Design a protein with these regions (language model features):
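Non-catalytic beta/alpha edge segments that cap or flank active sites
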Residues: 1-171
């Protein structure tokens, strides 16, 4: 079966949880979380849950696992906490809990960041995607530019396809 055939069979409405990882953001100041929600809704998807957690491994782990255990959520998307500062632990936390990594997501995100956005600073960009308990997880940097790039160029075009592939044998 071709990729196009897979996409035709993919679900059209994906139920999502957004997790913003930040020590400083509030619901009022969380531009990246709001942008994720806006782009998902514009594409016809649903936001089932949203939360902001501190840059702490246990808080991140708990928020992601809650999303993956929720029966009405298909995908968990995180933003923030992906840099190289000591407190940036989102990537390490997600990497520890996923059962399977979608390696191409991080690779393509850095390539697009380099060619379309921030040039050589892309080598500092960290992004990861994977699967836990039959749910997809995508983790992006917290800048609105990075969120827009990841969402419009990678996540939204493949979201239904990713969920379809996971559902084939994870449930």
């Amino acid at each position: 079966m071709s990729v196009n055939e897979h996409k035709k069979e993919a679900p059209h409405v994906i139920r999502c949880k957004i997790v913003t990882v930040s020590d400083t953001r509030t619901e009022e100041t969380d531009k990246s979380g709001k942008l994720m929600m806006q782009l998902l809704r514009e594409a016809g998807h649903e936001i089932v849950a949203y939360e902001i957690v501190k840059d702490e491994k246990e808080a991140i782990r708990a928020a992601v696992i809650r999303g993956c255990e929720h029966p009405e959520i298909d995908v968990v998307l995180t933003n923030g906490g992906t840099g190289i500062a000591k407190r940036d632990v989102t990537i390490e936390t997600v990497k520890e809990i996923i059962e399977k990594e979608i390696v191409g997501f991080g690779e393509l995100f850095r390539m697009l960041s380099y060619t379309e956005d921030i040039g050589s600073a892309a080598m500092l960009s960290r992004a990861i995607a994977g699967v836990l308990d039959g749910k997809a997880i995508f983790s992006t940097p917290g800048s609105t530019g990075a969120v827009r790039l990841a969402m419009t160029k990678l996540i939204l075009p493949e979201l239904g396809h990713v969920v379809r592939e996971i559902r084939k044998d994870w449930r």
